Amino acid sequence: MVVMPPQNSVNESEGRYLQDGFWQHGRFYGSWKPGKYLFPIDSEELNRLDIFHKVFLLARDNKPFLAPIRRTSPRIMDIGTGTGIWAINVAEECLSDAQIMAVDLNQIQPALIPPGFMPKQYDIEEPSWGPLLADCDLIHMRMLLGSIQTDLWPQVYHNAFEHLTPGIGFLEHIEVDWIPRCDDDERPANSAFVKWAELFLDGMDRFNRSVRVIPQEHRQMLEATGFTDVKQEVIKAYVCPWSADRNEREIARWFNIGLSHSLEAMSLKPLIEKLGFEAEDVRELCERAKRETCVLRYHTYCNIHVWTARKPGPQQ
């Protein structure tokens, strides 16, 4: 049965609204094309997505994008916009004359939006992006791993390519590699965070919606699609603020908050529905991982991957 969440679970102060959906495993999920988006859409999840916007800004010198925009009234698409925070940030602070289409499977964007901001509910796994904005200067994609069927990534990149302006259209794609890493072995021998990541990745593989970041595969897919000037950047995000570097500490503070909100939200469905866990066991593992990521002597980090690519002109 489709139900609406209790009124007090909606973050009204930010003018957001939730579409029809359903409760499962103690969280609220969207009901449009159920099973495609495996993570919640409740107010706690909206906060998580906004926290990661801050993480990515800090990791990229407070710049929401790096692609050169050459037209005075650019056309931009934000694919998998979530709360719309990136698109709103660009519209309000960077490109006030831009036409920005914010595309997502779920209608969780705010009711009050800036001029030029166009929310669009659409399934980007469709073979064609016909209804979406064409002739784009920039297409931005972020944290889509797990939301795209694993074998459909070439199709997604192809559709992005087709909707960019030849010669000046750029794609920017950002993902978090959830595999915990450590350069100095300063982490516990039986790490709960490592265990969580292994199970989470395994469960998502079984949904055929992999969250594994394989950098060379994405580069090869972009080049095979026809993109040129393909570049990749890797940024460390420590899970707690132990570093002597001020910027690394600030990224880590926000990443720690985002991670603490992510553990349960992302792993409930894959661990319960694909690996046979009980909900309380998932939450217990997440709590242990959360406590571990707050210990300053553990120097664990995750990598943030950024790919940028350009659609060549007709003579290139």
From Swiss-Prot:
It is found in: Nucleus. It catalyses: L-methionyl-[protein] + S-adenosyl-L-methionine = S-methyl-L-methionyl-[protein] + S-adenosyl-L-homocysteine. Induction: Expression is regulated by the VEL1. Coiled coil: none annotated. Its EC number is 2.1.1.-. GO terms for cellular component: nucleus. GO terms for biological process: methylation; sporulation resulting in formation of a cellular spore. CDD domains: AdoMet_MTases (cd02440). Its main location: nucleus. Disruption phenotype: Reduces gibberellins production and subsequent virulence during infection. Reduces both the fusaric acid gene cluster expression and production of fusaric acid. InterPro entries: SAM-dependent_MTases_sf. It is an enzyme of class 2 (transferase). Keywords: Methyltransferase, Nucleus, S-adenosyl-L-methionine, Sporulation, Transcription, Transcription regulation, Transferase, Virulence. One of its GO terms (molecular function) is methyltransferase activity. Belongs to the methyltransferase superfamily. LaeA methyltransferase family. Methyltransferase that performs automethylation. No other methyl-accepting substrate has been identified yet. Component of the velvet transcription factor complex that acts as a global regulator for secondary metabolite gene expression. Controls the expression of the gibberellins gene clusters, but does not affect bikaverin production. Controls the expression of the fusaric acid gene cluster. Acts as a virulence factors during infection, most likely through activation of gibberellins biosynthesis. Component of the heterotrimeric velvet complex composed of LAE1, VEL1 and VEL2; VEL1 acting as a bridging protein between LAE1 and VEL2. Interacts with VEL1. This is Secondary metabolism regulator LAE1. It comes from Gibberella fujikuroi (strain CBS 195.34 / IMI 58289 / NRRL A-6831) (Bakanae and foot rot disease fungus).
